[in-house]
């Protein structure tokens, strides 16, 4: 999942990071965040 496609911000909250984290949880990771436009999952 690329964060550029999901990037939008509302009232200072970057939704792309939470969408990335949710994506990582779905695939069995411990969450994640966007780094340079790419969703990076934690192990």
Curated annotation (Swiss-Prot):
Gene3D superfamilies reported for this sequence: Knottin, scorpion toxin-like
Swiss-Prot/TrEMBL GO biological process terms: defense response to bacterium; humoral immune response; innate immune response
Similarity comment: family membership: Belongs to the invertebrate defensin family. Type 1 subfamily.
Parts of the chain that traverse the membrane: none
Name under which the protein is recorded: Defensin-B
Chief subcellular location: secreted
Disulphide bridges: 3-34, 20-39, 24-41
Cellular localization per UniProt: Secreted
């Amino acid at each position: 999942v690329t964060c550029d496609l999901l990037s939008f911000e509302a009232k200072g909250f970057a939704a792309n990071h939470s969408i990335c984290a949710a994506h990582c949880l779905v695939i069995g990771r411990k969450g994640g965040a966007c780094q340079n436009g790419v969703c990076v999952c934690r192990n």
